[in-house]
Amino acid sequence: MKIKVLTYNIHKCVGGVDRRYDLGRIVEIINHHQPDIALLQEVVRHSKSLSDTLQVDVIGEAIGLSHRVWVPNVRVSEARGYGNAIFSRWPLIESVNIDLTIGPKKKRSALYARVRAPIFSQRAGQSQTRSLHLFNLHLGLSGIERRMQLKKLLLHASVQRVAKNTPIIVAGDLNDVWGSLGRQVMGPAGFHGVRRKPKTFPAYAPVRPLDSLYVRGKIRVENLLPSRLAIARQASDHLPLVAELILGQE
């Protein structure tokens, strides 16, 4: 079964060049790509125009992904805290926020969720569901910090308990300036990505592969590309990454 996953640091819906808050641009981009799962970073608590409504709910309703979870990493203030969010076409069975903060560094975390995705079983001759484990990350700014954070994640029970054949997706803003985390950390842990890392930062003229996606188990990456929409170069300081994945059977 083919599924589409989008990962996107939305920069609190503030344009990377014009510095203008515009949630509508973010929604337009996501709706264009029609993902089954969206992993967003830097989602704020409240939208400016709807101060009593959680931004995760506004976005979720606008992109038609009704199953969602959001946890703030950074609390600038109670109203303006921001963090990671997962949106899914299919029900979220469980979720947990995993602290990846290293010492006195800025607070960082991975948001974990498990969904039951539908697949067609040739053996059974009918549609079934299977578990898909999602990890949405926003890693630190130093190379040592990022490697330590990924290793901390890989040792967490939410990863360790998952059987080797069960599909896992690890994606997000990895701040992977040199595109080396796959070779240094994820590959040795049994995860696969793409050989040529798509450049996503800065959005208006990308030169760095800060964002990425890795999989393990009965799932493979068929395509991983940055959005080529003109509006995506304005809406945030990152481009979204869009992945087409092939999900295998149990």
Question: PLM features: residue spans?
Answer:
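A short, gly/pro- and small-residue-rich
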Residues: 57-59
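Active-site regions of metal-assisted phosphoester/phosphodiester hydrolases
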Residues: 1-37, 51, 61-62, 67-71, ...
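Active-site neighborhood of divalent metal-dependent phosphoester/pyrophosphate hydrolases
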Residues: 41-49
